């Protein structure tokens, strides 16, 4: 007979959390990341009396959902949270709770959140949690900038003429101090110049994009990414008419001051200046930057540079030593002047072709930081350089591609430098959360069986405390049966007894292929703690403190652990073993 759906109203009790799949992204984020720090950041901006406000953590999570799932409109975001159970659960709303109005976001953002610098602090708090989990080590970093169009029309473009003070280009305070101590340094005289800048009437903070084939009004987003798992460690937003090479050193210095490790960094050709090379050295970073082929280098005329002497060697073997700094009056930039000492050039047979008749010695002008410039060029073409360039293309350029395609910053929707920075930080935070939880779950090989073994809440509290997380990935062959059982285990103490596995029988599913063995999940014992064992082949890969030297199964088989090797998972030392052949006792 034909069935009909009953429309009668029924009252039921529902646990919202039970409706969210174990593998859902928001469930992973909720278990791995704590947002309680937001209460401490915003406490000074909420009065102690009065009617309670909307929970700021719930509102912050709503904004994150918008950038995680590409929901650009805040009106639509409120509708999606109203309808989507997973979104409600993640934000802490029950089914009968009222969702905040879309206007609440704009009022709260301008009145409280922008004053507290919440988004910048929240971004670095997430990065700090990634560092504590071992997902960021700074061994391979990449930085790049990307131009993002602003939300303005072509008719709003205007040319604004401003008066600015022309001064020495400042890259880094320590670099400026080092330059001022060199011979020949003279601070250029203060000079007021008039500059014309293209911007928009509707968004005066934006600037003109003139980069390759890109044209328009927008912003420059500068970002640094750790190539281990693609976690973005720093995001800054500037007007589009700023130069990347001038901004990069202070961008990196801010991250180092916040405790972000950074040892090797890959950059593109746009950062190829002597000041950037020297600034990276002062920051303790090894830089990998493609070399620009200049049209008129000293090497073209047979000169070579000797880094030990800090001198150029002419074709006749005479050194041109460093003499002093020369300042260009038109640009305010400094150049290192190398010249021949004495009258060696006057007796040289190549003098007529080397320089004009009025001169008495040959000079070579180079970058004010040429020694660091040369050291950076020495790394070009090495295996490390090629590897870093590949990582830069994957993680730096790839991250910008993902941010623009999936996380709402293909175009800046709000207006003003503060609002543009907020958008870029939220998008970067959303990408970091995705990569963070996926990396941790990939490390620990977590499946739903973990919840039945030791409980998700206790397990993730265990992980977040950065304790030892021994994880057994063992492979064992039981006759012709290949079983796979997998989940993390609790810490087994040093000197734990043998692992005892309950003997299992093949199970038939009664359908096609009957007689084949099904994968089953059975708990085993390590010391006094329950864990799970992954069984697949006759080789074992075990992560566990030392002291456990062999397996003993209930059927009487033994396997000796060999090839002990230390590894690091989530910043925690673990030991990986491989077993020899399984034998009967």
Describe each PLM feature range:
Residues 483, 501-505, 522-523, 533, ...:
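Cationic, low-complexity basic patches in intrinsically disordered or flexible, solvent-exposed regions
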């Amino acid at each position: 007979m034909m069935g009909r759906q009953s429309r009668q109203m029924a009252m039921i009790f529902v646990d919202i959390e039970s409706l969210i799949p174990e593998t859902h992204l928001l469930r992973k984020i909720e278990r791995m990341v704590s947002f309680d720090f937001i209460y401490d950041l915003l406490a000074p901006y909420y009065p102690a009396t009065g009617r309670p406000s909307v929970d700021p953590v719930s509102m912050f999570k709503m904004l994150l959902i918008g950038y995680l799932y590409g929901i650009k409109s805040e009106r639509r975001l409120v509708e999606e949270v109203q309808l989507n159970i997973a979104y409600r659960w993640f934000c802490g709303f029950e089914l009968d709770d009222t969702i905040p109005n879309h206007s609440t976001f704009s009022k709260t953002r301008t009145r409280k959140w922008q004053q507290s610098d919440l988004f910048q602090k929240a971004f670095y708090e997430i990065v700090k949690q990634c560092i504590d989990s071992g997902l960021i080590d700074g061994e391979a970093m990449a930085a790049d900038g990307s131009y993002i169009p602003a939300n303005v029309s072509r008719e709003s473009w205007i040319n604004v003429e401003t008066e600015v003070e022309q001064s020495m280009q400042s890259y880094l305070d320590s670099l400026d101090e080092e330059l001022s101590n060199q011979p020949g340094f003279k601070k250029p005289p203060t000079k007021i110049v008039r500059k014309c800048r293209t911007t928009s009437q509707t968004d005066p903070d934006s600037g003109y994009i003139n980069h390759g084939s890109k044209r328009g009004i927008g912003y420059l987003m500068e970002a640094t990414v750790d190539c281990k798992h693609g976690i973005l460690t720093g995001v800054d937003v500037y007007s589009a008419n700023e130069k990347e090479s001038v901004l990069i050193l202070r961008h990196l210095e801010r991250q180092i001051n916040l405790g972000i490790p950074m040892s090797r960094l890959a950059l593109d050709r746009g950062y190829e200046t002597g000041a950037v090379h020297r600034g990276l050295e002062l920051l303790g970073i090894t830089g990998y930057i493609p070399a620009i082929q200049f049209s008129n280098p000293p090497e073209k005329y047979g000169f070579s540079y000797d880094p030990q002497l800090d001198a150029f060697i002419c074709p006749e073997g005479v050194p041109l030593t460093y003499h002093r700094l020369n300042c260009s009056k038109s640009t305010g930039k400094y150049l290192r002047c190398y010249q021949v000492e004495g009258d060696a050039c006057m007796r040289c047979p190549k003098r007529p072709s080397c320089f004009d008749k009025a001169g008495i010695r040959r000079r070579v002008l180079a970058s004010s930081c040429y020694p660091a410039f040369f050291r950076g060029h020495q790394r070009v073409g090495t295996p490390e350089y090629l590897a870093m360039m590949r990582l830069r293309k994957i993680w730096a350029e790839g991250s910008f591609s993902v941010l623009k395609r999936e996380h709402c910053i293909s175009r800046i929707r709000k207006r003003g430098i503060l609002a543009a920075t907020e958008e870029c930080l939220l998008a970067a935070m959303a990408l970091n959360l995705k990569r963070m939880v996926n990396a941790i779950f990939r490390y620990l090989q977590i499946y739903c069986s973990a919840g039945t073994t030791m409980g998700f809440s206790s397990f993730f509290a265990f992980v977040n405390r950065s304790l030892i997380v021994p994880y057994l990935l063992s492979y064992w062959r039981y006759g012709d049966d290949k079983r796979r059982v997998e989940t993390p285990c609790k810490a087994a103490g040093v000197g734990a007894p043998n692992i005892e596995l309950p003997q299992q029988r093949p199970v038939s599913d009664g359908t096609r292929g009957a007689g084949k063995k099904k994968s089953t999940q059975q708990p085993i014992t390590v010391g006094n703690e329950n864990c799970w064992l992954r069984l697949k082949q006759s080789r074992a890969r075990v992560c566990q403190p030392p002291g456990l030297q062999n397996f003993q199964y209930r059927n009487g088989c033994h396997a000796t652990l060999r090839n002990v090797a230390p590894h690091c998972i989530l910043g925690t030392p673990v030991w990986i073993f491989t077993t020899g052949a399984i034998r009967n006792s």
